Amino acid sequence: NNSSPRLFQDDSSVYVYSEKELDNLTIGITDMMGNVYHYEVTTVPACTYYAVPIASLPAGTYYLSIYQGSNYVIGMFTVN
């Protein structure tokens, strides 16, 4: 469905995009070992690309998890 948040990545950030406002959204970045590199609770406005900075992360593969209540999206991305 179109209301699910979508994830995009460039060299400096991972972006959360949603067509509807997402309140009390928890965004976390962890590595494969479970170490937490980023954690925040925020609101993503409708039709906005919300940037989560990744430029300072060490090279490797990470999980980006997004939770809102019982709904969640987990994505994987790599930093070179």
Residue ranges: model-predicted function:
Residues 1, 63-80:
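C-terminal tail/sorting-segment detector
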Residues 17-20, 31, 54-56, 68:
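Non-cytosolic beta-sheet module surface loops
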Residues 42-43, 78:
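Residue-level structural signal for beta-strand termini and adjacent loop
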